[in-house]
Curated annotation (Swiss-Prot):
GO CC aspect terms: plasma membrane
TM regions (residue ranges): 3-23, 387-407
Organism of provenance: Acaryochloris marina (strain MBIC 11017)
UniProt subcellular location: Cell inner membrane
Name of the protein: UPF0754 membrane protein AM1_5604
Stored InterPro entries: DUF445, UCP032178
Length: 409
């Protein structure tokens, strides 16, 4: 076999294999190169820049449409959101946020948290709370159970101590009804008409010794003399009245009566009426003066100091730290129930906000043609290497066929 025949047999398979193996790289390079338009004067050379750089905007739109219609559909995004928002993941995220907030509160040295809390408490006490209380006071059952409990457990058991009863009895004897007041009351009572009525009743309605005294001696003159004595002899009359109060033990009787005074001794019907009146009084007072009273009470409280105490308590409270897990679990369950109902609607509303198609278009448009070519070449070399090898094999096969044709021709 001479060299010409050997060349006919060997060269076509080798050339076909080389061409087939490097065709993919050559084709990809032809799609991208040249990267920029080549101009001679003011005229652009044909086929410059390459096919993809020249139509990069349209390619970006096609890529975006393909991804949004085939890959990132609303159903797929909803499935992704469901996987991301599983209860365990949501609970972990909420727990992390709560722990982060607690750490921030513990490390807060600028009193910022306390100031924010103080403003919230001040606004709530001055504005929101009074309006809420007054609105609730318009209801018939406003604090009914609570007020009944206060009445039954506090007011119903309220009773004066011995010292309080002694002080109140002294006040009654010395201030309310002193001897001079009793003297004046006696003078006002012993009018001529009352004296005549007493004299007539004693004469007609008594018997025995009292009848004899009333009819023989009479009481009219004695009562008139008593009235005259009270009017003319003030000091002596007051002394006699004071002596009578002492000898009769009126002060001690007042003490015993006041010490035994209690709402429990009243009839059940009266107690029920007092309970109802107590509720209505509190309700009416709240409706009329509740806003002003609560606002004045709110202004009298040092909310800055109160907020600081609360924050310090939170910083050292073990209950807050141990309850974060339970709180995060409850919040995660609430969020899960909400997402089960409204996740599809949320995804539909979120898609226009995310504007994923425009993000893809912008990303493709802002990617340099060199980077696109390198990315595609990398995919071909790593993921599509079998196609490259297949191209070389096909080139060798075609070269062998060509060699056979040349030999037999």
């Amino acid at each position: 076999m001479d060299w010409s025949t050997l060349g006919v047999v060997i060269v076509p398979p080798i050339a076909g294999g080389i061409i087939g193996y490097f065709t993919n790289d050559l084709a990809i390079s032809m799609l991208f190169k040249p990267y920029r338009a080549i101009k001679i004067g003011d005229r652009r050379l044909p086929f410059t820049p390459g096919l993809i750089p020249r139509n990069q905007e349209r390619l970006a739109q096609k890529v975006s449409d393909a991804i949004m219609t085939s890959l990132l559909t609303p159903e797929e995004l909803q499935a992704i959101a469901q996987r991301l928002l599983q209860t365990e993941r949501v609970q972990g995220a909420i727990f992390w946020l709560l722990q982060l907030a607690l750490d921030q509160v513990k490390s807060d040295t600028g009193q910022r948290t306390a100031q924010i809390l103080a403003n919230i408490l001040r606004d709530f006490a001055d504005q929101s709370l009074p309006r809420i209380i007054v609105a609730l006071a318009r209801r018939e059952d406003f604090l009914q159970d609570q007020l009944d409990q206060v009445f039954d457990q506090v007011l119903l058991d309220l009773q004066l101590t011995d010292d309080q009863a002694q002080q109140l009895a002294n006040w009654i004897i010395n201030v309310v009804v002193p001897p001079d007041t009793l003297r004046l009351l006696l003078i006002d009572f012993l009018t001529d008409r009352n004296i005549a009525i007493l004299d007539r009743d004693l004469r007609t309605k008594t018997s025995g010794t009292y009848w004899l005294v009333a009819n023989v001696m009479g009481v009219q003159s004695s009562l008139v003399k008593l009235r005259t004595f009270c009017i003319e002899e003030k000091l002596a009359c007051n002394a006699i009245v004071a002596e009578l109060l002492t000898s009769l033990g009126i002060r001690q009787r007042f003490v015993e009566w006041l010490a035994s005074l209690s709402l429990q001794n009243l009839p059940v019907r009266t107690v029920r009426q007092l309970r109802q009146q107590f509720r209505e009084s509190v309700r009416g007072y709240t409706q009329n003066k509740g806003i002003s009273v609560l606002q004045n009470l709110g202004t009298s409280v040092d909310w800055d100091e109160t907020a600081m105490l609360i924050v310090k308590r939170l910083q050292t409270s073990e209950v807050v730290t141990t309850s974060l897990k339970d709180i995060s679990e409850d919040l995660a369950l609430i969020l899960e129930r909400y997402l089960e109902r409204d996740l599809e609607m949320i995804v539909v509303k979120a898609l226009p906000i995310l504007n994923l198609d425009q993000v893809i278009i912008d990303r493709v448009n802002h990617t340099a043609p060199e980077d696109l070519e390198a990315a595609i070449q990398g995919i071909v070399k790593t993921e599509l290497q079998a196609i490259v090898i297949l191209g070389g094999v096909l080139g060798i096969v075609i070269g062998l066929l060509q060699s056979l044709i040349l030999l037999f021709s």
